[in-house]
Every structure is written in C-alpha cells, then in structure tokens.
C-alpha cells in the first residue's frame, strides 16, 4: 500500500494506488447481491471466465472532490450509472441498478476518506466501477455469473500537457478506434486494449497520444486517445464531434451546457472534418481523466495545426467546471452528489 503521508498531491500522475477498501457485488441466479466493502484487492476467478477470453467487461470512471468545507462531492454519478447500463446491455450483461451503483460509489468514498485529495490540490479521488463476466465457461456466450466492483485511487493529471503545462501534442493514427456499428459508443474493455498500439506509436514519436479518425472515410475527427475532442472557432463557437462510434462523454456533455448557458457561446455537436482544423483557435481533449487538456498541436499527414494552449475560453471552461466539481459554484440540478 502506498504511504499516504508521502503522497505528493500536486504531482500524482494517473496510476494505480491501493487504497483501503473496495466494493464488490455478485450476480448469480438472476439477481445482484447487496454487495459490500472488502479490503482485499486481489480477485480469484475461474480460468473459464468470459472476461479472460472474450472480453466481456465494461467499466466507468468518475471522480470525487473535496470541497472547501471538507465534504466529498461526486460529479454526475447518475450519468455514469446510466452509461454503465448501456454498456452492459451491449455485451448482454445484467444491468447494475442506479441505486446499487450510487450506493457502491458512496460507500467506497466514505471508507477511503483519508485518500480524498485536499481541497484545491489539483488531485482527486478517481473511482473505477466495472462489471466482468466470470464463472466456468468455454464457448462464446454470455457468462452466468458476474462481478460488479468499485475501487478508487487518488490521481492527478492524465496528460502531462495539462492546463498549467502549456498544452498537449497529438498525431493522427492509421488505426481505427472502433468499427462502424461496433462498440465505440460504449465503454467496454476491448476498445481500450485495441488502442494500446496506436498510443505506443504516438508516444514513441514524442506526442502525448493519438487522434482517431472516423473508421469509414478517415476524414473526420472522432476521439483524442481516451478522451473526447472539442474546438473553439475564431468567432467563439464551441464545436465537438458527433458520431455513433464516439463514447458519449459526461464531461463533454457538461461542457456543452456550461459553454451555452454560462458563457453564452454557440454550441454545435456535429461532424468535424480534418480540413476544418484551421477554423479553430483553441482545441482540447476532455473527459473524466483528462478533465480539460488544452491541445497545442495536431499533426496530420505531415502538416501541423497549432492552437492557443490554453486559450481564453478553454481556461474559462476549465475554471468553471472545476469550481462546480469542488462545490464553489452552484451546479445545475443533479450534477453534484454529496457523500454523507
């Protein structure tokens, strides 16, 4: 276990740190158990578990922040619960109820309060809920038994080129993140295993990650590594890609609301052609892990596109989002879940 006293909260990075407790529920005979907290972080699975052979696994990611008053605040956990249900349906897995999901997350945060990052430290407590197919199995078919688990770890910035570091650099990849009508729109494990080679190739060239284009024409932006993309045009419009193979980002949905209702910007969710990049003065990667990471350069077909990093609007959105997540500013209804 990591030494809590020696944690450098301002330079944590994004990696696994064993905390004290995690939540586990089991699915057998057609229903989920009540579940509960355990201290052991090792799992014992049958060698026939479908998760090991056929990738029957889906997961979520959300964060808890410490408010100025010391309260633990979860950001839009109900949206994560709904997205996990969609992912479960796609892989023929039993849905985790919203009640079970919220209770599990709350119990994990309460049991690991000492790992909750200090207020305004730049860090947070990241929660990883996931569902896996387990039990004795050999053929390609859904599991009969499942585990729903939530663990947590204190984390810092996902990309090194964060909001205070001058932005990140990305290059387009020849690989597709997802197939048309595939699993790109859900958060399943196989999508991320397939991304490892593209990520490795990008980082070996000195970039922070790769940019995936649409799998049909390879002319439109889809995702930025494991995050969503947005751009700010020269006339101050917030534009973000739309495609059924893009994971519906909760952070992106939130930024669209903030850009429109708080900053009075024009907001569009539509296809974005690579040829349009010159129309953007700012660009960013957004997601639970990335929060908002400004993009300073995108390379495509040996051509570089440069952006303000961070630009004025990107910084305003970042500050606004963080102030809501940390309880400094009143949030839209149902965005903040206070853990008692």
UniProtKB/Swiss-Prot annotation:
Entry keyword set: Amino-acid biosynthesis, Aminotransferase, Branched-chain amino acid biosynthesis, Pyridoxal phosphate, Transferase
Known cofactor(s): pyridoxal 5'-phosphate
Modified residues (N6-(pyridoxal phosphate)lysine): 187
GO molecular function, one term: L-isoleucine-2-oxoglutarate transaminase activity
Pathway terms, separated by semicolons: Amino-acid biosynthesis; L-isoleucine biosynthesis; L-isoleucine from 2-oxobutanoate: step 4/4; Amino-acid biosynthesis; L-leucine biosynthesis; L-leucine from 3-methyl-2-oxobutanoate: step 4/4; Amino-acid biosynthesis; L-valine biosynthesis; L-valine from pyruvate: step 4/4
UniProt cross-references to InterPro entries, sorted A to Z: Aminotrans_IV (IPR001544), Aminotrans_IV_CS (IPR018300), Aminotransferase-like (IPR036038), B_amino_transII (IPR005786), BCAT-like_C (IPR043132), BCAT-like_N (IPR043131), BCAT_family (IPR033939)
GO biological process: isoleucine biosynthetic process; L-leucine biosynthetic process; L-valine biosynthetic process
Chain segments annotated as coiled-coil in the UniProt record: none
Keyword DNA-binding (UniProt): no
EC number(s) on file: 2.6.1.42
CDD domains: BCAT_beta_family
PROSITE patterns: AA_TRANSFER_CLASS_4
Catalysed reactions, semicolon-separated: L-leucine + 2-oxoglutarate = 4-methyl-2-oxopentanoate + L-glutamate; L-isoleucine + 2-oxoglutarate = (S)-3-methyl-2-oxopentanoate + L-glutamate; L-valine + 2-oxoglutarate = 3-methyl-2-oxobutanoate + L-glutamate
Its biological purpose: Acts on leucine, isoleucine and valine.
NCBIfam families: ilvE_II (TIGR01123), PRK13357.1 (NF009897)
Family of this protein: Belongs to the class-IV pyridoxal-phosphate-dependent aminotransferase family.
Descriptive protein name: Branched-chain-amino-acid aminotransferase
Native source species: Helicobacter pylori (strain ATCC 700392 / 26695)
């Amino acid at each position: 276990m990591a030494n809590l006293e020696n944690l450098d909260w301002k330079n944590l990075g994004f990696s696994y740190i064993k905390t004290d407790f995690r939540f586990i529920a089991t699915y057998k005979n057609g229903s989920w158990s009540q579940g509960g907290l355990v201290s052991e972080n090792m799992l014992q699975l049958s060698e026939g578990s479908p998760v090991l052979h056929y990738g029957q696994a889906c997961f979520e990611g959300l964060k808890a922040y410490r408010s100025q008053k010391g309260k633990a605040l979860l950001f839009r956990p109900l949206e994560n619960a709904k997205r996990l249900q969609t992912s479960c349906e796609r892989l023929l897995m039993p849905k985790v109820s919203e009640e079970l999901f919220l209770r599990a997350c709350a119990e994990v945060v309460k049991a690991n309060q000492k790992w909750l990052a200090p207020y305004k430290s730049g860090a947070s407590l990241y929660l990883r809920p996931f569902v896996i197919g387990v039990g004795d199995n050999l053929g390609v078919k859904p599991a009969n038994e499942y585990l729903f688990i939530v663990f947590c770890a204190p984390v810092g910035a996902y990309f090194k080129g964060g909001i205070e570091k001058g932005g990140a650099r990305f290059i387009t990849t020849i690989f597709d993140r997802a197939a048309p009508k595939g699993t790109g729109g859900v958060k399943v494990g196989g999508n991320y295993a397939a991304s490892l080679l593209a990520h490795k190739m990008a980082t070996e060239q000195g970039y922070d990650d790769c940019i995936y284009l649409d799998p049909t024409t390879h002319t439109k932006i889809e995702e930025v590594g494991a995050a969503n993309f947005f751009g700010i045009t020269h006339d101050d419009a917030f534009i973000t890609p739309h495609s059924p193979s893009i994971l519906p980002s909760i952070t992106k949905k939130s930024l669209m609301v903030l850009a429109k209702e708080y900053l009075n910007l024009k907001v569009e969710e539509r296809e974005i052609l690579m040829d349009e990049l010159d129309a953007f003065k700012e660009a960013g990667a957004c997601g639970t892990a990335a929060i908002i990471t400004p993009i300073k350069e995108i390379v495509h077909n040996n051509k570089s596109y440069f952006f303000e990093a961070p630009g004025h609007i990107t910084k305003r959105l970042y500050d606004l989002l963080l102030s809501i997540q940390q309880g400094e500013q009143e949030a839209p209804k149902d965005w903040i879940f206070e853990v008692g």
